[in-house]
Amino acid sequence: MNQAIDFAQASIDSYKKHGILEDVIHDTSFQPSGILAVEYSSSAPVAMGNTLPTEKARSKPQFQFTFNKQMQKSVPQANAYVPQDDDLFTLVMTDPDAPSKTDHKWSEFCHLVECDLKLLNEATHETSGATEFFASEFNTKGSNTLIEYMGPAPPKGSGPHRYVFLLYKQPKGVDSSKFSKIKDRPNWGYGTPATGVGKWAKENNLQLVASNFFYAETK
């Protein structure tokens, strides 16, 4: 139990240290419901703020979600994520540092939006809300990619960019056909600097359950 709580706090500390809460999540009360594991290869995992070469991240990575109820210990019950077999998820990758950390004219830049994902082992955990722990990859059958994956390509000399993955639970019974359209990658199509997934997620009533991120730079 304590390990889960410690990991949740370590995640929050990392979000704060690297400006993820302030610049992307926009919710200082956010508590992760589990771990979003992201791996480009065995030698290129995403690890809460590590640095990866851009060439290692050209193809879409593999994802796994590990739910741990104890990570939500300080979350009000009304706001806690309770797993259900029919849950649909949206996976996002966004860059809040486009074209640089001091120039936000393209920020956020949308790199991936994949919706209507299901847990691959959805039938192996309870639906009573008593589930304490499970780990699952995602079933992409029937999923809908709104924005195709684009690997990191920060402008030369623009400094390190944060590439942030976010896992959202979609509202019950709502698939992505009901979501607002993403008109462009820069600013997520809103045309306003420093605008992106937070606004889009709020429009579509998405619940953030986990996040991970890495840095990449073109020197």
Curated annotation (Swiss-Prot):
GO annotation, biological process: regulation of proteolysis; regulation of Ras protein signal transduction
Entries under Gene3D superfamilies matching the protein: PEBP-like (3.90.280.10)
Main location: cytoplasm
Keyword Metal-binding: no
CDD domains the UniProt entry points to: PEBP_euk
Pfam families, A to Z: PBP
Molecular function terms from GO: peptidase inhibitor activity; phospholipid binding; serine-type endopeptidase inhibitor activity
SUPFAM superfamilies per record: PEBP-like (SSF49777)
Domain of life the protein comes from: Eukaryota
List of residues that carry N-acetylmethionine: 1
Keyword Acetylation applies: yes
GO cellular component annotations of the record: cytoplasm; fungal-type vacuole lumen; fungal-type vacuole membrane
Cellular compartments annotated: Cytoplasm
Keywords: Acetylation, Cytoplasm, Protease inhibitor, Serine protease inhibitor
Record's subunit section: Monomer.
Protein task: Specific and potent inhibitor of carboxypeptidase Y.
Miscellaneous information on this protein: Present with 1030 molecules/cell in log phase SD medium.
PANTHER family, per the entry: CARBOXYPEPTIDASE Y INHIBITOR, PHOSPHATIDYLETHANOLAMINE-BINDING PROTEIN
Family: Belongs to the phosphatidylethanolamine-binding protein family.
The name this protein goes by in its record: Carboxypeptidase Y inhibitor
Organism: Saccharomyces cerevisiae (strain ATCC 204508 / S288c) (Baker's yeast)
Lineage, top ranks: Eukaryota, Fungi, Dikarya, Ascomycota, Saccharomycotina
Gene: TFS1
